[in-house]
């Protein structure tokens, strides 16, 4: 029974876009707290220095995809959040395939 519960929990967590900061992390923590109600969570504001690191700004994505020359939408972030590298910078424009390949990771 516990194996199926863990699997169902993982399926619930999978579609949430998580980074090291942001709404996805907060949503994930709330789901975890359903199973660990005594979990203590501390928040640290953006810009806080932590040893040799600074807490970054939240990274929020509304949508991301690639359109083929025929207009077909591929690599759609709404279908799989792994289609976008975390902390990617916004881009809106047309580039050729060779230039696109310089920005793809497989």
Enumerate the language-model features and the residues they cover.
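N-terminal hydrophobic/helix-forming segments and targeting peptides
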Residues: 1-106
